[in-house]
Amino acid sequence: MNLKLFPVLFFCLLFTSGLFAIENTKDTLTNQSNKPLRSYTTTRLTTARPTIDGVLNDACWQTGEWAGDFTQLLPTEGAKPTQNTKIKILYDDKNIYVAIRAFDTEPDKISRKLGRRDELYGDMVGINFDSYHDHRTGFEFTVTAAGQKIDLILFNPMAWDMNWNAVWYVKTGLEDSAWVAEYEIPLSQLRYSSDKEQVWGMHVWRWIDRLSEESDWEVQSMSGPGMLYAFGELKGIKDIPKSRRIEIMPYAVGKLKTFEKVPGNPFADKGRSWLGNVGLDAKIGLTSNFTADLTVNPDFGQVESDPSVMNLTAFETLYEEKRPFFLEGLNIFKFEMGDANLFYTRRIGHTPEYKPELGENEYLKYPDNTSILSAVKISGKTSNGLAVGVLQSLTANENAQLFSGGKTKDVRVEPLTSFTVGRIQQDYKEGNSTLGAIFTATNRFINDPYLEGMNRNAFTGGIDFLTQWKEKKYFLDAKFIGSAISGSADAISNLQLSSARYYQRPDAGHLNYDPKRTQLSGQGGSLKVGKGSGLFRFSEEITWKSPGLELNDVGFMQMADRVEQETEISYFVNKPVSIFRTYSVGIHQSNNWDYNMNYENSSFFFTSAFQFLNRWGIAPSVHYGTDWLNTRILRGGQAVLIPAIWEGNLMAHTDVSKKFFVNLSASKEKAGENHFTSTSYEATATVVPYNPLRLSFSLNYTKNQDNLQYVDTKVLVAGTKYLLAHLDQKTLGATFRVDYFITPEISLQYYGSPFASVGKYTEFKEITNARAKNYSDRFEVMHPMLLGGNYVFGSYSISNPDFTFNQFRSNLVFRWEYKPGSQLFFVWGNERTGWKNDANTKVGNAITQLKDVASNNIFLIKLSYWFSL
């Protein structure tokens, strides 16, 4: 069958089966939508405010209305909960007060396990306010039975941001046959309209850990289009003042770095250095629904290091954001399209791009990150449904210190740079449709000729549109993006030659490399249509990116010059059936072309997940990829035909509510012609020997054998040679965590992660006929001589590419939230990194040899103090 016709035939089949399912499947959402919304009418506080101590003996709790009659969501949707729950809500001009009484006929089995803040752990109760009442944003305040806080922002359809840390007060306590939670939530932590009488969306839920049971005050459905659409209503809030909140948090930090002494190096001859810093974070309520966040000279040190990675591809590794300023409230700035994102926050304050080459007896003190002078973001939503977000950040002229000829001088390694991001989204048709736009600008003020390889100005923009119909069952999601980059000829040449596009590819007739260009522009987009609620769901999507599209100045994108088509079908069962508590199955199919519609490959996935009645679970999946015309493997050379590949994966876990539980995973990949094989295993065990202490250990091992691993490109008089080899790579990693919780506010945590990867290159090859029908005709096996650490191939040579990379990273962190919003940290960070150009070490021995690698340490103390005006 012609694979180019497959998406058309597949979509026809999908559409037919979708119509059948619509006609014959009882849709939980439809039945749910016909039920009236639950509502709760709160009472204004007329007595003294409660003392937040987890004991409901204050006079105010004798007023107001208790509400109950929760409905089970898990494990049996719509059933009566096994335990009763009651809530009461009061308010005044400053706070919302909440009491939740979680009854339990077996109080000795209440799970009061301590965990980190924002960790869903043990028995829990929570309340979520959709204070905009727009069915798009919910502010959640959850507490565990042990008293640990969990706060998050909920978004539809089923996404959340757990990095939002509000300042609020809660205590828990025990009664004869219940546990209780007593809240004080400042109105300053919420955003709401200026209406005289407020109506908010409200969701209240409870989790019983030993039963894996969730019950909700309002009726929710796992098959719905999103939780916020099914929220109940909170009424009765009247005449509350407009919020003009001002929150300020200054901080001070001191660091001691220790490292290996290097005689003659003035930056390392003492083996230590002292650093100190002060700064300020502020949050200003411009109106009751718009907030400005400001940071001056921020401390963006990360408490936990990035994981170790051995990246042998041509593409950048995407790392998770961990800095609070760039985490909180940034959901509005998200604009993702496939693997591309117009705003990747780690571009701001990144490691400097330029690094000078050193001569003999020269030493360099190089900054880890670019200094952020200031950053401001303004975000909020009007009563008419217009969401607005603006972020602006300025990073400094960053200098390294170069010691040469007995003197030290500053060398500019990153120019002064301005980053601007703007985002708007307008709701229509009672939240069923949204229209939005985004704009980003990166402006570098370059005054040094050797920095002209960087882009001077980069602008990107996009428009997105989402509409839903038939009670939000069906949706159409459309995005259109564009970019315009300007800079020197060197800068634009770098973009043309980069792995995102490789304009120099000799067999890409639609591409034209021009070394004199000073501008580059491109566009892209995606169209997705499908059924997004109910037990049966499907979608069809097409995504395209023109060759000139470039997002990487303040966004993230690995590949341009792409057209992708994807089809997804899934079926979910959300009630116990036979031995299963829940299960889901899915099919995913995709086709890929370059922008000139030259076919590259197709992929087919089968995924599934099963949870058993004993709360153990497994998730098997299978992937098949057809023969692949890989346009990136030679990093600028012609496309190479790669054999088809099979992949199988299996994940399994035991009951995570137990004091000891295990997660396991295994995968196997194998391509035809013995082109590629990969086997990987990972196991994680977690044990809670007694309540305040938790231990976790994970071990992972991967073995890869790649017959066409890229090595080098040599431009010779006789022509360009693309050199590849057979790579045998083994990777071993482990992670050990210890968490000890003295109280919910005081904890001691340790994280340690050794990592090693050993790679041996053999059977070197030159590409001869990249698309030959027979695999062995696509290359010629070479027989170089190894002389003095170099492989000699006659007219050229390369250094030995074998490697042994090992690294150890660890953190020991003492945290004390001595008052809400204010913290004291003591941190010890340790890192050891080794590298050798040989593969004579077994990967396990490379781990043990870390003890002989020089150690770098950071000892840090940080104090922050939060107050409001």
Predicted regions, residues:
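Outer-membrane beta-barrel transmembrane domain signature of Gram-negative proteins
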Residues: S221-K242, E398-A458, Q468-E471, K531, ...
